[in-house]
Amino acid sequence: MLQQLWYGKSGWRWLLAPFALLFAILSGARRFAYRRGWCKAYRATVPVVVVGNISVGGNGKTPVVIWLVEQLQARGFRPGVVSRGYGGKAPHYPYRLDAASTTAQAGDEPVLIARRSGCPVVVAPKRADAVRLLEQSGEVDIIITDDGLQHYGLARDIELVVVDGVRRFGNACLLPMGPLREPVTRLKRVDAIICNGGEPAKGEYAMRLVADVPRRVRDDAQATEPLPRAVDALAGIGHPPRFFATLAGLGYELHQQVGYGDHHAFDRDELVARFGQRPLLMTEKDAVKCRTFALDSWWYLPVSAELPASLLDTLLQKLPSLTVPRSGSGL
């Protein structure tokens, strides 16, 4: 319902205008308080890069985080990642992921990032607590926060915003009247805007997701021969139609395409009842939640972000100046 309200044409949204105004006042006052120093932001001893967005829903932040980690590792940096760990309930906070960590403990995105990149990943409701743990470890020289653009309790040195290039900003209204956490003017203060799909606006960096060979959910084994053209598909992400469009573009005929809410907790019986023994394709983010109970007929599609080298060059140009003592909130 809200998605239709935000991204379609509906006069109903004006009924939510008073709530959007209240949200604007409260969030704006909070942001102003941090910028003026009335509220103190934690300043890390190493550079902090935020990868976030100004709208709710999945815009492709996690592939960007993985891309950034891999690019930094290739250039000799030792990155670590912090996240809120949404959807998980860890035994304690801050919680550092290890090989045995589950999505029930840490959330799906942190588990995926840790598996794909191999870098240290720490989750905590207060990201500053996660940052402190990474600092104390001595293992990292730069920290990337997955989401958290609006988490002003953590000072940052670089801000990257990912935009859905197809849906853009919907009706451009603030929550709950529209999908925006912050007004579009907030983008004037960020270091780079990444456009995921669609046509990038002037000054934005174009990003596309490149699909790899499907892998079996149960054991990550790569498919040795093409999957049947006719498959079922599920996606428990912020915008499932994007995944289904990717599969259709790869030539798959989707008998069933079922979208679930972001961070949906899947159950084996639920999925078997819905899809039976038929070949089933899902996102890698969903696969990390289904691995322990997956059937042999369940597969996921790995995707990687492809971004211009000029984006990394821009970031690296900023990093040398961050080795000197820094002050302020970076907001």
UniProtKB/Swiss-Prot annotation:
> Which residues constitute the signal peptide according to the record?
none
Q: In which pathway does it act?
A: Glycolipid biosynthesis; lipid IV(A) biosynthesis; lipid IV(A) from (3R)-3-hydroxytetradecanoyl-[acyl-carrier-protein] and UDP-N-acetyl-alpha-D-glucosamine: step 6/6
Catalytic activity entry: a lipid A disaccharide + ATP = a lipid IVA + ADP + H(+)
Q: Which domain of life is it from?
A: Bacteria
> InterPro entries annotated for this entry?
LpxK, P-loop_NTPase
EC number of the protein: 2.7.1.130
GO molecular function terms noted in the UniProt entry = ATP binding; tetraacyldisaccharide 4'-kinase activity
Which protein family is it in? Answer: Belongs to the LpxK family.
Alphabetical list of HAMAP family matching this protein? LpxK
Q: What does this protein do?
A: Transfers the gamma-phosphate of ATP to the 4'-position of a tetraacyldisaccharide 1-phosphate intermediate (termed DS-1-P) to form tetraacyldisaccharide 1,4'-bis-phosphate (lipid IVA).
Output this protein's name. Tetraacyldisaccharide 4'-kinase
